[in-house]
Curated annotation (Swiss-Prot):
Protein name as annotated: Protease HtpX homolog
Key words of the record: Cell membrane, Hydrolase, Membrane, Metal-binding, Metalloprotease, Protease, Transmembrane, Transmembrane helix, Zinc
Lineage: Bacteria, Bacillati, Bacillota, Bacilli, Bacillales
Species this chain originates from: Bacillus subtilis (strain 168)
InterPro entries: HtpX_protease, Pept_M48_protease_HtpX, Peptidase_M48
Major site of localization recorded for this protein: membrane
Length: 298
């Protein structure tokens, strides 16, 4: 389920960096759209406008290609009964997603896909409710029973009906604006400490480095938002599939996560500085026990 967030953020960083590089090169060649003053300083308002344009173009471009990127990077095989014959299990998966989608009020059915992976995972993505994708791992279908699968699918459909990807795109656009603005200022400061003939190349390299670093730091804001929205998707999933199935799905995920943690405990411990704080900051999902507790109290 974290795949959706990580794919979106990775795509955003790549798109944002590419747009920034292209615009910077064009600006240096043509002089159009530059935020530098005649004396080599920075015009804050011009830089802010530049940052807003780059930031939101980057986030909405990431949203527009999110479904294609997910299929490409995860190797998702779309299940289309009109084009290919499906196995009984595959047809059942498509029927479940479509049934839940109709119950949620969607008028255009999401694409449904499977990707090969032993992990127990699923995600929903896409630029709009009418152009969405629900994908599940082969490991999820192999290790979860029908009730748990139903809960997971309902959770992912709830993400689509809640419009979480669009809201996240707006948030990412704001984060991107700060990233672009601060990275340009930091790069400009760095270029002031070298010889004048080296300043342009230092500014360019520093800009790329600072933009990537600030993008990673900015992703913490997106992660925090994602954790908040998971509770809403859990409630939406409970409304669609039933509270018992949603809780059962989360308990199954918890059981799976516990087995993985036990298998990898030694390796994980050697990398920890403060495991609890680190995982809470960089996690896209809240603690499973807390999610179960909130659903039980619903």
């Amino acid at each position: 389920m974290a795949k959706r967030i990580f794919l979106f953020i990775l795509t955003n960083i790549l798109v944002l960096t590419t747009i920034g590089i292209v615009l910077s090169v064009l600006s240096s060649v043509t002089g159009v759209g530059t935020y530098f003053t005649a004396d080599g300083g920075i015009d804050p308002m011009a830089l802010l406008v530049f940052s807003l344009v780059v930031g939101f173009v980057g986030s909405f471009t990431s949203l527009a290609i999110s479904r294609w990127m997910a299929k490409t990077m995860m190797g998702v095989r779309v299940l289309n009964p009109k084009k290919h014959s499906l196995s009984y299990e595959e047809q059942q998966l498509v029927d479940r997603v479509h049934r839940l989608s109709r119950s949620a009020g969607l008028t255009k059915m999401p694409e449904v896909g499977i990707y090969r992976s032993p992990e127990v995972n699923a995600f929903a993505t896409g630029p709009s409710k009418r152009r969405s994708l629900v994908a599940v791992s082969s490991g999820l279908l192999e290790q979860m029973d029908d009730a748990a699968v139903e809960g997971v699918l309902a959770h992912e459909v709830a993400h689509i009906t809640n419009g979480d990807m669009v809201t996240m795109t707006l948030l990412q656009g704001i984060v991107n604006t700060f990233v672009v603005f601060l990275s340009r200022i930091a790069a400009w400061i760095a270029s002031r400490f070298v010889k004048e003939d080296l300043a342009p190349i230092v500014h360019f390299i520093a800009m790329i480095i600072f933009q990537i670093v600030f993008s990673i730091l900015g992703s913490l804001v997106v992660f925090a938002y994602s954790r908040h929205r998971e509770f809403h998707a859990d409630r939406g999933g409970a409304d669609l599939a039933g509270k018992d199935k949603m809780i059962h799905a989360l308990r199954t995920l918890k059981s799976y996560s516990s087995r993985i943690l036990e298998d990898d405990q030694t390796a994980v411990q050697t990398l920890k500085i403060n495991g609890k704080k680190r995982s809470s900051l960089f996690s896209t999902h809240p603690d499973l026990d807390e999610r179960i507790r909130r659903l039980e109290a619903k």
